[in-house]
Amino acid sequence: MSGFASKLTSAASGLAAGLFAGRVLSELWAEGNGSTAWWLAFAITLLCILGGIWLFNRFPFRQSWPALLLLIYVFYPEFNLFVAGIAAMLVLLTWWQVNEISLPVPKNLAQIIVPLLLLSFCFLLYFKTLAPDILTADNGEFQLVAANLGVAHPPGFPLYTLLAHLMTRLPFGPIAAFRVNLFSAVTSTLTLAVVYVTIFKLSGRIMPAAAATLILATATTYWAQATTANIRSMTALFAALMFLTLSLFFLEIKKPDPNRANRYLILFALTFGLGVTHHASLAFIGLIAFPFILIMDKSILRSPARWWKPILAFLAGLLPLLYLPLHAYADVRGASPSLATIPGFLEHALATGFRGDLFVYLQPALFMERLRIMINVLTFQFSVGLVLLLALSLFFLAWQEWRLAFLFGGSALLFTLITATYRAPQTVEYMLPAYVALILVLGIGLGGINGRPLPGSNTIWSSLRYLLTALVIVIAISQLASRFDSYSYLNKDYTARDYANSILSEAPQNALLLANWHWATPIWYLQEVENVRPDVEVRYVFPESEPYAETWARRVSEGLADSRDVITTNFDQDAFAALPLSEPLGEAFLFRQEPQSNLPGDFSEEDLALGDAIRIIGYKVDKPEVRLTDEVVLTLAWEPIDSLEDGATLFAHLVAVDGSLAGQQDIAVQTREEGITFTQFRLAPLPGMQPGQYQIMAGAYGLEPYLAADGSPRTAVSTVQINSSDFAPATNNPLQRQLLDGSGHRLAGYDVDNTLSDRSRLYLHWQSADGYSSEVFDNTIPVLPSFSGPWGIPSSRWQFLSRTKPANYVPLGQGIVWTGSSSIPANIEPGQGLTIRHSFLSTAPVLSDQVMSMRLIGFEEDGYHWAWWDLDDSIPGMGAIPTLKWIAGSRVTSPHFVSIDESATLSQEIGGALTLYDAFTGRVLPLLDGRLAAEFGWIPISVRSPAVQ
């Protein structure tokens, strides 16, 4: 490059740096002073440009080119200092590598210090966000069996149980359950250590190893597993150990002395044995590992003498299985004499009861849909950009060393394909070994193989590699920043204990508690580890041959016939219709032998008559303060004044200071012949409600309203304080626009909803010093004050998405937002099957298991009554991504399979109805768009109108 060209390119780097510095300094001025005058921003930027050109002319372009990346923020359309920081970090990390700057310590010491600091940070991160207490479902079971040396569900997980039990013996942490949670943080950190070592051993580079390790550490499900009691963290650890031993075998096999390579084969066999002992799914890695070994060393087939040590090591890895028969007669949870028999042992250790779930989705259409979902599973963990980087890294790795690409990429692909066929309720967790393999592809693909030629020009490849490595670190830091609030929130979540205590503390003496698996395990923990209410008998209600709801109803009837008070965690309105009236017990349901005649002690007394029909004698509000994203739980205690007419309905309202309706629920009621009737309401504040004090009002109606004493249709019961949300509302259009009206408000995003074609709705999401809230505008665009734009210069250019564009944004309870469904072919015929995919966003971690119910409807000629319908209810993502796994910012697409009825006509209007409901209680998730709730009661899905044929 000529001297003039060199100066010109260096000046370009200086210009980029100057523009960036000028913009950031101007915006920092605006941050402290409200805004920056255009002339001041111009002067600051001009000085920075001159200084940048002068400074960068001292460096050749091959050293200064990373500064051009600062143009990312120079042209970024919003004032956002976080994005500026990300751009600056990207440049510094790239520049650090381009100029081969060393840490101010000896190289050998740096190779120790960097991973130690990284791993210490990750462990402290997990400790800071660790689940604090008992957990539900499998997590709760693992806490219980670890504390009492019990036997977990098949395959039993004996090695995990023993190691977690040792953890419970350590003298720190408040309770055993906490220490079992901490064990996951330990195993997850060890997995990160193994991943780092594997990448570093193969690439010899610190930064790619650290970048890839941090990506895995902050992946959604990996972080979740690192902070809760589970067996998946150990599954990931054994997968990582297998990959490490095979990588070391790869490095040693070509050396003159084969003994070290043989030792790594023995270590692989041991970890493989321990791995499949822990979880049989790791055997699938063997389908790739064994061909890899043969590819690397074909002579092993001709050397049987080399087999026996690996075989013995593998058999040694199976020794933990002896725990099962040795505990067959122990008086602990899960133990059974059948474990001491060969058939019983094999059935448990091999988990043969789950064999019907494997290879379920092999039918081509279902399998292709599952592959779509597997892509969503990956984007649930990593950003779309990172998933593309994974594919690019696999290409780089295959170019340099196809055998390693076969090992890591093949393992990830095989595990993904097999998981896609598996009817697993939590596919995001089953995929952990695949995430480990993919991260190894990422780190080694970017870091390169020590001593191997690189594709293309070394200079071009090196520059690209440096840039992509820096980009991975920036993505990892962004993942950390975006997900920390969710896991910090879960660190304060005591839902399982609160639920279990609400039942056990109020349960009648010697009651029978019928529980689903989700709630049975934490209740068992309280009883068996903390000795809470051992008089209450807890029975897990497992599925039988009949419909599950009918099993519950039968079990309740049997308990009542046995003269016992019965509590259930599940409720089904149709199946329970013939049972006596229940009363709420926390979130559970109590069927009493004798009706309640006295008001419970935690209720406030009241005497409110609603017409000549109902007298409210007391109430309970669960919490005096909630957030905008929480539900207000109100329980009314009442008695009939006279016999109630059919269809009598109680309602509860949340009412703002100005009298506007902030939340509502109507419940058709039944009454007892004797005693008090209890009705529980869950009031979700509607979007647009602002923080403040709200009244809780109640009323009732039949054919006419039941008027209160003052003649009004509703009467005040209590008040509740509603505070701003701690989480930014989920949005398709994030912004950071600081208003200049002195309010301190910042627009955090906006969304447009055109679900109703003739009634557009605009949501504005605001951030203030107290938290987040939203405003709602129907068929209008508000006039807003000026805001601080790029360079901190005041701007009034408010531009929102066209309100005529197809856009959907329908908030539901618990922070879930429906953002639309896939388009339907215009030409649909009778009998045709349809796949309708719904998209969702999450504002905050979801703490309930929601079922998505999609109903396809053929309307009669009046466009109102139904001629036919088809229903598909499923857990999101065909069970792959349950709502219990969602955190703030999660994006999930869920397919539903419905069919056009054979009786449908070409001119018939066809539509759809989408609702979400609790998998256990059947409670419908509140629809927080008052227009849709009043007109439909569900989210209407447009499929075909008579005009479209």
Positions of PLM-derived features:
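Transmembrane-helix motifs of polytopic, lipid-linked glycan transferases
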Residues: 48-56, 182-203, 241-245, 392, ...
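Perimembrane helix-loop-helix junctions
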Residues: 91-102, 250-251, 256, 284-315
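Membrane-interface transmembrane helices that cradle and orient dolichyl/undecaprenyl
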Residues: 52-63, 200-203, 242-268, 272-275, ...
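C-terminal luminal/periplasmic domains and tails of membrane-associated envelope-modifying transferases
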Residues: 501-515, 521-524, 530-949
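Transmembrane-helix signature of polytopic, membrane-embedded enzymes
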Residues: 56-68, 195-218, 237, 257-260, ...
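Hydrophobic, aromatic-rich transmembrane alpha-helices
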Residues: 49-54, 379-402
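Signature aromatic-anchored transmembrane alpha helix within multi-pass, membrane-resident enzymes
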Residues: 13-20, 398-401, 444-482
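Short acidic/glycine- and proline-prone juxtamembrane loop motifs at membrane-interface regions
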Residues: 224-232
